[in-house]
Amino acid sequence: MEVYLVGGAVRDKLLGIPVYDQDWVVVGATAEQMLNAGYSPVGKDFPVFLHPKTKQEYALARTERKTGQGYKGFECFFSPDVTLEEDLLRRDLTINAIAMDSQGVLYDPYGGQQDLQDRILRHVSEAFVEDPLRVLRVARFAAKLAPLGFRVADETMQLMQSIVASGELSALTAERVWQEWHKSLLTPAPQQFLAVLRQCGALAVVLPEIDALFGVPQPEKWHPEIDTGIHTLLVAEQAAKLSSSAVVRFAAQVHDLGKGVTPPSEWPSHKMHCHTGLKLIKQLCERVRVPNEFRDLALMVCEQHSNIHRAAELKPQTMVKIFNKLDVWRKAERLNDILLCCQADHAGRQGLQDHPYPQAERIQLAYQAALSVEVQSVIQDGFKGPAIRDEQERRRIEAVKAALLNA
């Protein structure tokens, strides 16, 4: 029985970046031997076992054969005769097909170390096209490794385009699409996930609402980049710099979906996009099974970002009305998340990345002033029933007015 560390752990170790998960492959063993050694079986479709102490995953070496459509259409073959090279051959990218033994000796039959050095994401074999999920995985690796200068090999991009052309992406479940998208939101460069999917044609299939933004013009006065799709990539990049929250990053990526359905006769203006975008966000989130926490913030940002950009013009009563609608009295962190998205939107414009965003400070000032009006003081002054809320509202507006006058 031979045990090797494989996949992302070896890749990240060689790149000098933190290793979080360790996966192992076992060559020359049977399931019975693993059970006798105290390992617990967890694999449903193929033999994967948990180590009795570390609880890390150990998989028996296996080969795969395409038997049907989609990423589930595979038959696994495992036996003590399957070699390490055969197991590594079924993997997606050369940089993920390097193994390391207990002595630290590397086994790299497919040139993964050279591709690590050259910063290339390259498929291991032509069997790459058999699994449509790999299109999304490569896009995610491009996002994860973008700061190190990685790019997708031209021949791998061609295979990704052929997978898209085959129609196999439609076999991906909503859960798998969201799983990869969500993981990409936690990478250093989430915009690369969208950019690579766009390049191979997959964005139009899995996230058509975002793909529809490319080629849609905006007023050059406010958007030097003009193209709404390019703006979306820039906003995604800025959101990742401003916040590590996947929820904030998601909301920033989808806040302008409404611009994708503006009639061309109205271009480059998008007067109704804050309203039309709401339906598209709901539709996207339902189809891809996006968690409610992500959907809710995205809807708020979509509806309010234009108002917040105009903070200098907003009347105190309008500000309080917005605070009420967002329910920031009970959820203070929500306002901060929305302002981060708006700041990313403001900075996500060609050549304007470093422009200040005083609107956030003004909204926060107004919020703190309104928050200082406590309901207890209203009750102590003799107000009862519905009059309590009305008076608190009136005092909040006055407090905001005074705070902004003194600013």
From Swiss-Prot:
Comment on bound cofactor: Magnesium is required for nucleotidyltransferase activity.
**Keywords per UniProt:** ATP-binding, Hydrolase, Magnesium, Metal-binding, Multifunctional enzyme, Nickel, Nucleotide-binding, Nucleotidyltransferase, RNA repair, RNA-binding, Transferase, tRNA processing
| A Gene Ontology biological process term | tRNA 3'-terminal CCA addition
Q: Which reaction does it catalyse?
A: a tRNA precursor + 2 CTP + ATP = a tRNA with a 3' CCA end + 3 diphosphate; a tRNA with a 3' CCA end + 2 CTP + ATP = a tRNA with a 3' CCACCA end + 3 diphosphate
Binding positions (Mg(2+)): 21, 23
Residues recorded as binding ATP, renumbered to this chain, are: 8, 11, 91, 137, 140
Quote the record's binding site residues for CTP. 8, 11, 91, 137, 140
EC number(s) given by UniProt: 2.7.7.72, 3.1.3.-, 3.1.4.-
Q: Give GO terms: molecular function aspect only.
A: ATP binding; CCA tRNA nucleotidyltransferase activity; cyclic-nucleotide phosphodiesterase activity; magnesium ion binding; phosphatase activity; tRNA binding
What sequence ranges are listed for the domain HD?
228-329
Concerning PROSITE patterns, the annotation shows: HD
Cofactor list: Mg(2+); Ni(2+)
User: Can you state the subunit structure given in the record?
Assistant: Monomer. Can also form homodimers and oligomers.
Q: What is known of its domains?
A: Comprises two domains: an N-terminal domain containing the nucleotidyltransferase activity and a C-terminal HD domain associated with both phosphodiesterase and phosphatase activities.
The family assignment reads: Belongs to the tRNA nucleotidyltransferase/poly(A) polymerase family. Bacterial CCA-adding enzyme type 1 subfamily.
Q: Which NCBIfam families match?
A: PRK10885.1 (NF008137)
Query: Which PANTHER family does the record associate with it?
Result: MULTIFUNCTIONAL CCA PROTEIN
Q: What does this protein do?
A: Catalyzes the addition and repair of the essential 3'-terminal CCA sequence in tRNAs without using a nucleic acid template. Adds these three nucleotides in the order of C, C, and A to the tRNA nucleotide-73, using CTP and ATP as substrates and producing inorganic pyrophosphate. tRNA 3'-terminal CCA addition is required both for tRNA processing and repair. Also involved in tRNA surveillance by mediating tandem CCA addition to generate a CCACCA at the 3' terminus of unstable tRNAs. While stable tRNAs receive only 3'-terminal CCA, unstable tRNAs are marked with CCACCA and rapidly degraded.
Print the miscellaneous field.
A single active site specifically recognizes both ATP and CTP and is responsible for their addition.
Q: What is this protein called?
A: Multifunctional CCA protein
Source organism = Vibrio vulnificus (strain YJ016)
Which gene is transcribed and translated to give this protein? cca
